[in-house]
Amino acid sequence: MVIVMYSIKMRASKNGKHISGAERIVNKDEIEETVKELVRRALTHENGTPDFINIKIEEIKEEITYINHLPIKTIHCKDKEEARETAKKILRNEGIPDSVIDYAYEIIDKGGMRGAAILNLKGERLEPDKERGVRVKNIDTTKELKEKILKENLGTERTVDAIAIASKVIHLGVIAELCTSDNKSYTTGYVATKKGYFRITNLKKEGESGGRVFFVKDDVDIEDLINKLENKPFIIK
C-alpha cells in the first residue's frame, strides 16, 4: 500500500518582512498536529510576533528521495574572526577563491533575503531574484535523525532544519554552502561540503542578521538546479 505524504510549509512575516519559515513532510494522520507545531513556532519566534502567517498543505505527487545526512562535526571558535577564518579554510579546500568567499560574507552580512544567493567560482550571482534568493523546499528529516541529533547533543532544533537543507543541496551537486541564522541571538553557523556539515560557533555576533550562500561550478545548469532545490522532495535519514 502506497502511503500518501503531504508537504506542510509555514512562513511568517511582519509588515512584509520575513520572520520565520519551516517545513515538514508528513502522512495524513500527522497533518493536524504538525500544523499546530508550526503555528506555535511562528508565534513564539524571537524575531517578533508576525502579523501574517501562511500555512500551505500539498499532497506530494512525486516520488520522495531518501538520502543519508551529511556527517555532523562541531568546531568551537572563540570569536567571529577565528570562526570566519575556519569557514574560509574549509571553503578554500573545495577550490573556492578567497574573493568569492569574501563576496559571500558581504551578501550574508547585508541580510534580508528569504532564500539563498548562488555564486559560481567567478563570483557571479546566478539566482534570478536577488532580493528573494532561492528557497530549498520539499524537505524534512526522519524522526530518528531528529532524535539522534538532539539526544546525542550533535546540535539543536535549528541543526535538524539545517541538516535537511545542507544534505539535499550537496546531494544535488552544489560544491558548498555557507550559512548563518537569521535568528538574532543564534551565533552558530555552518559550512556544508561533500565532506560533512561543519557547525562553527561564533560565525556571527549576537544581533547580526544571517544569510545563506550556495557555491556552484561555472558550468552549472542553473534552471535545473533551482527547479530541483525548490521542488524535488527529499527526506534526510
Curated annotation (Swiss-Prot):
Homodimer. Its EC number is 6.2.1.14. It catalyses: heptanedioate + ATP + CoA = 6-carboxyhexanoyl-CoA + AMP + diphosphate. GO terms for molecular function: 6-carboxyhexanoate-CoA ligase activity; ATP binding; magnesium ion binding. NCBIfam families: bioW, PRK01322.1. Keywords: ATP-binding, Biotin biosynthesis, Ligase, Magnesium, Nucleotide-binding. Catalyzes the transformation of pimelate into pimeloyl-CoA with concomitant hydrolysis of ATP to AMP. The keyword ATP-binding applies. InterPro entries: BioW. Its cofactor is Mg(2+). One of its GO terms (biological process) is biotin biosynthetic process. This is 6-carboxyhexanoate--CoA ligase. Pathway: Metabolic intermediate metabolism; pimeloyl-CoA biosynthesis; pimeloyl-CoA from pimelate: step 1/1. Belongs to the BioW family. It comes from the Archaea. The keyword ATP-binding applies.
